[in-house]
A protein has these predicted regions:
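Terminal RNA-binding accessory module
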Residues: 1-73, 109, 359, 367
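Rossmann-like S-adenosyl-L-methionine
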Residues: 2-6, 16, 222-457
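Short, solvent-exposed loop/turn elements at beta->coil junctions and helix N-caps
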Residues: 116-123, 189, 198, 202, ...
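Extended interfacial segments that mediate partner engagement and assembly in macromolecular machines
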Residues: 57-69, 75-186, 206, 221
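Short beta-strand elements
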Residues: 12, 126-138, 143-149, 201-204, ...
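Short, aliphatic-rich beta-strand segments
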Residues: 201, 208-217, 277-281, 382
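Short, conserved phosphate/pyrophosphate- and ester-handling motifs at nucleotide-, phospho-/glycolipid
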Residues: 37, 164, 289
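Short, acidic/hydrophobic/Gly-rich beta-strand patch recurrent on exposed beta strands
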Residues: 20-25, 146-149, 213-215, 346
């Protein structure tokens, strides 16, 4: 087989990134956009010794699980890997992915782990409360906004995203008209010239409050009063609450700058998860799917088994989303987060909700927890962890084992590191009692999982 040669392959499996997997004469091929059960014609693009990557050219026999993607740019955009798969099959794929990692990486037996059915969405569209659109130009020099094509920084023009809120289209149209009227150029990565880099849009699902923040390659936004007028006036956007710009003059892939200049409104929007109110600024971390977040955190709260007498540690707590949920049922909650801005938000959110039994520490979980345990002899009945994709630090896990809480609730966004860390805790005297996946990101390969571990003896 040579590069650019075409061949026919039956897709028998899918890898963790959502690419179809098939074999030709014992050689493994990964075919993006193919679905289990498809028979496809593919073109060889890149080959290694025992496997290769191929481009989907034609679906010859569609799988029973294949559907027509609802999004017109599904294949070009890097955002959704599973749109060609029925939602029912997406959920099965995610459950299988988690279980496979628990068996393969965690070395658990399948009957050792009681996994409850995945929590899917009734409506797996329009679920994202946050969108970030890069700006650029098309080949004719017109200002465009959209998304980056997979693994590139080439902008795929898209006036809307079916995962985002319907107001996105309206806001993008206004921003493009504003730029044309004020003769403002979009940012160009190669030359580091041009002003508007991105537009950040956030919406409170329970409050209908909307935020717009332009990310600019400069200190000033010309015609800022006109932008406010266009977004808030008679033909503006309903629910517009906060308008600002973020200064980012660095040559970087990081979207937001550190300085936010407020143009209109209080500088934040509010939203609720359950009955807890949150203030969300342009730089705040906040779960992008609030509907499923409520289910996921509800599961974590249930697993914590709180009676009102417990001391709880919430590690990697972000802006305190889980902490404040737990504080309503616990005696005391301690939250730990590495990002100082997030801790400021957490303290403010506790104050807004009249929650006085939550205390927050800014620092690394693997430094704060051992220090509090060894120097101040703090106690924990329950420890909740919600780490980034890389999972928990070994020092952090060792300290959890030394503290010997009755229960550990592990909330994970990466089932590979989840499996690794669960094995570590299981070898240290904990039993994996039950777990449940939650589909926070329909259409994509990502899945969240909550697991309860109970101290053995």
């Amino acid at each position: 087989m040579e590069k650019n040669q075409e061949f026919i392959v039956t897709i028998e499996d899918m890898n963790e990134d959502g690419a179809g997997v098939g074999k030709v004469d014992g050689y493994i091929w990964f075919v993006k956009d193919a679905v289990i059960g498809d028979v496809v014609r593919a073109k060889a693009m890149k080959m290694k010794k025992s496997y290769g990557f191929a481009r989907l050219m034609q679906v010859l026999e569609p799988s029973a699980s294949r559907v027509v993607p609802s999004c017109p740019v599904a294949r070009q955009c890097g955002g959704c890997q599973l749109q060609a798969m029925s939602y029912e099959e997406q959920l099965k794929f995610k459950e299988r992915k988690v279980m496979n990692n628990l068996i393969r990486i965690g070395k658990f037996d399948e009957d050792e782990i009681h996994m409850l059915p995945i929590m899917g969405m009734e409506q797996p569209w329009r679920y994202r409360n946050k969108a970030q659109f890069p700006f650029g130009k098309d080949k004719d020099g017109n200002v465009i906004a959209g998304f980056y094509a997979g693994r590139t920084h080439a902008i795929v023009e898209a006036e809307d995203c079916l995962l985002g809120v319907e107001e996105n289209r309206e806001i993008l149209d206004i921003v493009k008209r504003f730029m044309k009227e004020m003769k403002i150029e979009p940012y160009d990565e190669l030359s580091h010239k041009g002003l508007v880099r991105h537009v950040l849009i956030r919406k409170g699902f329970k409050t209908d409050e909307i935020m717009v923040c332009l990310v600019i390659n400069g200190n000033k936004l010309p015609g800022k009063e006109r932008l406010v007028e266009m977004l808030t006036g008679g033909d503006g956007v309903k629910g517009m609450t906060s308008i600002s710009y973020s200064v980012n003059q660095e040559k970087t892939n990081v979207i937001m700058g550190k300085e936010i200049v407020n143009l209109y409104g209080p500088g934040y929007i509010t939203d609720y998860i359950g009955n807890v109110k949150y203030q969300i600024s342009p730089l705040s971390f906040y779960q992008v799917n609030p509907v499923q977040t409520e289910l996921l955190y509800g599961t974590a709260l249930e697993y914590a088994g709180l009676t009102g007498n417990e001391i709880v540690w919430d590690l990697y707590c972000g802006i305190g989303t889980i902490s404040l949920f737990l504080a309503q049922k616990a005696k005391k909650v301690y939250g730990v987060e590495i990002v100082p801005q997030a801790i400021e938000d957490a303290r403010r959110n506790a104050e807004i909700n009249g929650i006085h039994n939550a205390e927050f520490f800014a620092g690394k979980a693997e430094e704060v927890l051992p220090e509090q345990f060894e120097k101040n002899h703090v106690h924990a009945d329950v420890i909740v962890v919600d780490p980034p994709r890389k999972g928990c630090d070994a020092v952090c896990l060792d300290t959890i084992l030394k503290m010997r809480p009755e229960r550990v609730v592990y909330v994970s966004c990466d089932s590979a590191t989840l499996a690794r860390d669960l094995r570590y805790l299981a070898d240290g005297g904990y039993v994996v009692e039950r777990g449940r996946c939650c589909d926070m990101f329909p259409g994509t390969v990502h899945v969240e999982t909550a697991v309860l571990l109970v101290r053995n003896g």
